């Protein structure tokens, strides 16, 4: 195909965007991504593209915004490659993710349909798991980056920031699934908080999750998602990732990829976009190939729109929404076709790299999410096909009337118009955009009311959301297509083009603009979408666009609600003007501003429930704070908790004071000023009352600000005060996550030591009912001074135990050791987590210290975790350790866990009553009817006895003809041993046998060979009685060789019970570590682990507690 020539001009970053003043230019303000920010270096484009292609002639045709759904350029496919590989920045690659492939496989196997067969670990291919992990890690980075930006407003990441980040990044349906999973996990966690064993179970176990919540929390801290991380945020993020994995895995299995399509889908060579065969230079045969979904592969058959505009089949764009496949059913058609092939071939769905890539490439909800580009591609699959997500698919529900006689909500023509509105990518004017947005909102709001599970939050609690005029103008700026203005006959096309059009493949549909803008507005509890919401959406959805994160301002949630009359709106505007005057920083406008604020004057609250003093503290404006204090501002007024009056209050800010905001943003001079002026050092906490918000000291300890913590402690802040959750669930009267726990959870060792050094404050002598019952003493006989000291010590011990739990969960083992060093006892869980981290960090001295501490753990605290987590960890350390001290310490632990009870005895097997002969006939040639030849010597026997002795003898005798007088030769058995076997049979039991010590092993082998179970058990019992440290390895090796499980288990019990002595035995060490390289050492360790697990279950975890051994 002849192609137009391209100018070999290296274009700058400005070519990627219409400069908004907020980004796109090379010197634009970049978002604060901290450790999640991307590298400025970019790999070279593998396809030779280095710039955006020039505008094509076909784009100058007269199309309205609806036609942009179906119109794309051939060069646009190359433009996307250019955008992804060179011109657009890429997401950072994670060296480590907060989950393991073993955990991922366990999660997926748990989520599969039980009818698909048993979930066997190791049944999923490792390469597919690794591929899936890598893809979903990109979604993790996207969500973390958005949560990081949202957390800047309050310098804290809570569950609300994670939930909003999910709604910003994920489609409506995926976000709804993730939110439901997060709510379920948090509910389980809160319910488990009331139990007495909450510090003895891991956070993941308490939440019902597979991935480690503590590891996700540590990842968030290390990635600097926020200065402060709430534990609920880590639970939400963990549940979100698990939900994403399950969702993608279920889609892969549901796709049922047929064998004929087992190769990668279009552009699926790397799962990151259209491949080399999708461009205009692909062979003609490839261009005519259709995808299984009915649409054309990238660069496939031309659509009706492109044909109508004069395009040929050789230069057609990728198949797009309304032509090759209906826009609302593109993804469904692909899945349906796959389902048909699946049933045709009668194959079980397979999870492989090929099926994974094929599913991702054909799913518009997840393809863009899992790409490596920094901007988020939404609403398109790998072929560039636009489609509505299933949650917005009106054709799925044919709008049947809910009541008899009621008309359908939309006609079919209206449905097509609405769908085209949602999928529009370009507009020609602000009027056209306003009409499109109106149609879309009109469609989404009733859909949300009808299908609450589709995740379309189109309603605020106080009413429907609406678009401010400035937001529409900003959105029009990004969606505007100058060529569409040429529809007006009075407007002539410009002769000089000063702007570069973005390619179609990077333009998001209108529904994605709405989704992201609505999520941003919802996060700040606003009634309306403003221009900043649109700019934030442009930053996410378009390549090369950036803008600063939204700051905390008084006008964030201001809106002229249509429900208010003119007088109320006038007062709102005056109040807004007053806040603006105070926020400008001019201290000479305080009096004029106060006169505009309303009847509450200087203490008037904004829609966010904050006073001018709070906003000044957020900015760190010391001069304005002083002026407001001089003007009579209340130091200790709290953010209100009445949502009906102040609906835009962020839930986490309720009961915060001006001092809290100053501490949040680390403005130490302002904190000093407020405290000198009489601010309460504990914020809103009243003496003796429950605390439902975090104190300033908790917030300072969480961020690790040593100077601020010292200042608050000097002013009398109490580090033992925790936070009560609003559901009323708390484990202590003072709440959870006190200052000790905050510092330990974030790994601030110096701040934690500072808190420990703080002298204890004496409390009131009034006892609570809980403390009266705990003390078990009479009030009249209580001596106040000792009681105060005792109560303080108990409260501090509870606080430190909780801090130890969080530090161990999050992997801050040094903080955990510091807490242990002051006498706080171990729980099994904290000890195991600390040992795991020390082993991962290869800290040998710390491992030795922790192993020595195991004996301090009470046996009453042994739980199932010791079997499922502890034993595999310790045996892994034993396997990897080359340190004799560590090996000896582990042997001590194993012997201790095995317990003082004796090894379970082997019992004789009662021989079934069979035929027997007088011993006189033993090896008697007279009257014998069968002769055995053993070591060249004959041994005479009788068939009547041997035929019923065992299946082995029956088979030997049956194989010889009756009239054959030849001898039956017995190999591999010595004559004396064979004589003992025959003596056992003729005498009817082992009682008369005289077995020498050097014959017992051979007799055991013979009994096993001839399948004489009673004689075999008798030999096993003799071996068990004669076992000692010298022969135990030989007996065990012989028993394993023969497959005698009972004797092997007895030997394993002997090993565990005497391991402290045996570890010095060279033969035993050789058995464990497999120095001969025969591969048996690992099996021995696994067998020992299994035997010890059974023993622990019987003596520590069963109801009998030791009686079953």
Curated annotation (Swiss-Prot):
SUPFAM superfamilies, per database record: Ankyrin repeat, Histone-fold, POZ domain
Mapped ANK repeat ranges: 608-637, 654-683, 692-721, 735-764, 830-859
A Pfam family the protein falls into: BTB
Cell location: Membrane
PROSITE patterns (alphabetical): ANK_REP_REGION, ANK_REPEAT, BTB
A Gene Ontology molecular function term of the record: PDZ domain binding
Region (Disordered): 260-302
Biological process annotations from GO: exploration behavior; protein stabilization; synaptic transmission, glutamatergic
Keyword Transcription included in the entry's annotation: no
Transmembrane domains' residue ranges: 168-188
Coarse class of the protein's main subcellular location: membrane
Domain BTB: 928-994
One annotated Gene Ontology cellular component of this protein: glutamatergic synapse
Listed CDD domains: BACK_BTBD11, BTB_POZ_BTBD11, HFD_ABTB2-like
Membrane topology field: Single-pass membrane protein
Entry keywords, A to Z: ANK repeat, Membrane, Repeat, Transmembrane, Transmembrane helix
Compositionally skewed regions (Gly residues) per UniProt: 264-280
Record carries keyword Transport: no
Protein name: Ankyrin repeat- and BTB/POZ domain-containing protein 3
Organism name: Mus musculus
